[in-house]
Amino acid sequence: MSRFLHGDKGKVMRVIIVGASKVGFALARHITREGYDLVVIDRDPEKVDAITDAFDCNGYVGNGCCSELLRKCGIDSASVFVAVTKDDETNILCCSAAKKLGVKRTIAAVRGPEYEKEMSFLTDKLGVDLLINPDRAAAEVGIKMLRYAETVEREMFGNGAVHLSAVEICGNGVLAGVKLPSVQKVLEAKILICAIDRGGRVFTPSGQDEIKTGDKIVFAAEEADMEKTLNKLRITERRLKKAVIVGASNVGYYMTGILLRRGIKVTVIDNDEGRCRQMLECFPKADVVNGDGTDSELMEKELKGADACVAATSRDEENLVISMFARSFGTDRIAAVIDNIDYETMLKKSGVNHIFSTQDVALIDIIKDVRLLDNGTDETDSSMKWLYALNSGSIEAAEFEVGTDFKLQGILFRDDSFKLKPGILIAVIMRGGSVEIAGGNSKILPGDHVIVVSAEHRILSLADIVG
């Protein structure tokens, strides 16, 4: 396992996590896997033991706001402090204490809608550098999913000049059975396939590989070619007119607000009268129904005329049933909040493709922030500008600005001396105002911005991609 260094070469970057719940546990897995020095704090000794037994890290039982405990954990030498307890106020207070004790970067998870208007105050006055709202972030992810009936992930680089998408190949699709060298001819578009997920095995393809039914492919293209490709794959974006959201949870709250602001009609269903009343007070334009989302008769009635259904209750089991009801009633755009991976598999088999998790969204956002901070301030070969995670984090795409000391600068990609590590591909080169989908005649120069896609490695700088 490699250790990522920060600032002084030879010094491992320390990360402190307060909160050993599901998010804290999953975050600990990622942080230790990436080689950081991790310390975990929680009031529950069993949770602390579970994390320290599972991962290479230190654990302390106690209050993450306590200055004495934070000093014992080495707060003065820590680079990142993350508070992910289930209590918003505790997370804010812990970050404020950590900042006063000298930590470089503080990250707090806050879920309550009441903090939406307090973001600048919390960052400016209370020492919280980054506020992550897992529920709002998940709501935004869910709404992006509803643009298509099919499973599509889509991100943009270079102010929208370059698009990166992940799509699943259907049996009757034009790419099923096509070898990579023939892809552009079949699509009549210039794209580059960067990675393939085949039954959970993620790899960077070669010219000999053939696309198979069920593959999830990640590809890069300029906007016009991306639209042409999606049309060829029969994946079309359709305007949403009406959505049914089951569950007046925080995720349901945020989704309702976003959709209404976009002029989309929203029906909210919840079995708690008090929550229904609150939703109606916050969103008078919404149609709020006090009822049970697992009631098939109610769902059939409310889904008539709806373009999409979102299962956003606080229980995976309910969201599972709601999604299956919606599918059986012919709704083709269905999104469900699911944290249990076993349920995710079951839903996909039943044809429900849009599945998202507040836990996953929070993890990806935190890991991105940690990695960007740790992108070697003294590196001269490159600097990381942006980082995206696709395919549940198994594939990463990072934008780098090329520095003066990049070892492969000026070398044509087809030359034998241009060698990258396995599982890594340079997809796009942006130079001035031009965009180039990378090929054998491409080369990289200082000042270029490049998009690097990785299926096997976690990359901090361009030095990490050289083979």
Where do the model's predicted regions map?
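Cytosolic regulatory regions of ion transport systems
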Residues: 1-467
